[in-house]
Amino acid sequence: MTHLAFELRTSTPDSVAADLAERVEASGYRSLWVNHPPDEDGLGHLATMAAATTRITLGTAVVPISAVPPDAILRRIDETALPPERLRLGIGSGSGDKPLDRMADAIVYLRERTPAEIVVGALGPRMRALGATQADGVLLGSVTPGLARAAADDIRRQATAAGRPVPGVYVNVMAGVGREQLSELDGSAEFLTRLPAYAAHFRRTGVKPEQTWLAAADLGELPGLLEPWRDTVDEVVLVPVSAAAPGPARDLVDAAIAAF
């Protein structure tokens, strides 16, 4: 069974983030995430959301370890008093050579020092396999429902073959509602296709960015757009293209959980 989760960007004002976090938890979402650009403090923003909630799982999507190494991640978790028992620590390779080796070393380092769930952000099959055989979870992104389902099947099969517990499988899905947000989605697509890793991902999979997101003219279209995501992965993480205005973001929180 697939559950819904929600993600906010670090650009979301703290007051809005706290309000939305409380609403996400009360509405029954399975987890709450924050992105973590290399030069921003995603963990600090997540701490704001943690303070506004009591039980929901908290995730990072994802901390780039080339910019924020594992020891710095752990220091920031301590500084912000993030509860490790609620933390789903998503990490990504970032930039540089030997990303698989860097991630494998980071998983070992973090697992020895924190009880948090260690989640690997993965675009390609080799990073997914690393997550399947070494991590507690795998976070997919920029995939269609069909690709997400196939990747989840592969991850579970690889974990079973390795004789280890099956990791959680999660997927980020960008969402926009209304003309203004649909325009922002187009801008996000243009940005992603300029990033080498994402450009390679789209070439490899043969999909376009617009095939991987939820683009709704209005909230009434959400049920039909969410339907293909049922029974794909463990959690579909909705990522509003913009949550700066509290009203539309609250409406999305309410409408999506009601539709799923």
Model features per residue range: what roles?
Residues M1-F260:
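Active-site-adjacent structural elements that line small-molecule/cofactor binding pockets in enzymes
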